[in-house]
């Protein structure tokens, strides 16, 4: 549905912090998105987390979910960062980690719009590997004009 070139239009992040490789489903009626991140042993964070037992840092799993939610928010607004709007990750609730994410995994990212109050957006997010949840959270983003 969205390749990396289009994703780069909707996210201001760049290597090594762009954590969405492809969007496979964007459902405006359900206000949801499904995307993925291919986790390679070549990711820079594996050099230090942890060299003998590499696992993806939890904060980056949360960030990947927030980036997927950000794409959904931009699409719902029909806006892009180039238009002068950004989403800032400002918090999470009900955060749970269930299992580690390892090199070679495909991290599936799901986000569903929950609410918007003024410029504060809430999304219900999940990250899965092989159909099993590895992380879930309610992600809060702030919409800001540049």
From Swiss-Prot:
**The reaction(s) this protein catalyses:** a (3R)-hydroxyacyl-[ACP] = a (2E)-enoyl-[ACP] + H2O
What is this enzyme's EC? 4.2.1.59
The molecular function terms in GO held by this entry are:
(3R)-hydroxyacyl-[acyl-carrier-protein] dehydratase activity
Q: Which GO terms describe its cellular component?
A: cytoplasm; membrane
Which Pfam families does the UniProt entry name for this protein?
FabA
Q: Which GO terms describe its biological process?
A: fatty acid biosynthetic process; lipid A biosynthetic process
Principal localization reads cytoplasm
| Compartments reported by the entry | Cytoplasm
Q: Spell out the catalytic residues.
A: 49
**Which controlled-vocabulary keywords does the entry list?**
Cytoplasm, Lipid A biosynthesis, Lipid biosynthesis, Lipid metabolism, Lyase
Principal EC category? lyase
Family stated for the protein in its record:
Belongs to the thioester dehydratase family. FabZ subfamily.
Q: According to its UniProt entry, what is the function of this protein?
A: Involved in unsaturated fatty acids biosynthesis. Catalyzes the dehydration of short chain beta-hydroxyacyl-ACPs and long chain saturated and unsaturated beta-hydroxyacyl-ACPs.
Q: What name does UniProt use for this protein?
A: 3-hydroxyacyl-[acyl-carrier-protein] dehydratase FabZ
